[in-house]
Amino acid sequence: MARVTVEDCLEHVDNRFELVMLSTKRARQLATGGKEPRVAWENDKPTVVALREIAEGIVTNEFIAAEEIVTEDPVFAAFEDESNEAV
């Protein structure tokens, strides 16, 4: 298992803050089982796999946007209902 460095990831992402957001979204996709990894899992945690995908240039903001599926989460639906009533 090769180490992933921030510098490897920053070759494909504009800045560290964007890297944090991108890796968080991708790791969450992997952890919840909604998406398949694009690299070998090798007994790593979802965050490491997400960073490896970013370092290899496989996962980008465009990839995440295309892969995101809007789902109705009952927890957030309650907040949306309250905000719609206030208008």
From Swiss-Prot:
Keywords: DNA-directed RNA polymerase, Nucleotidyltransferase, Transcription, Transferase. The keyword Lipid metabolism does not apply. Its EC number is 2.7.7.6. It catalyses: RNA(n) + a ribonucleoside 5'-triphosphate = RNA(n+1) + diphosphate. It comes from the Bacteria. SUPFAM superfamilies: RPB6/omega subunit-like (SSF63562). PANTHER family: DNA-DIRECTED RNA POLYMERASE SUBUNIT OMEGA. The RNAP catalytic core consists of 2 alpha, 1 beta, 1 beta' and 1 omega subunit. When a sigma factor is associated with the core the holoenzyme is formed, which can initiate transcription. NCBIfam families: rpoZ (TIGR00690). This is DNA-directed RNA polymerase subunit omega. The gene is rpoZ.
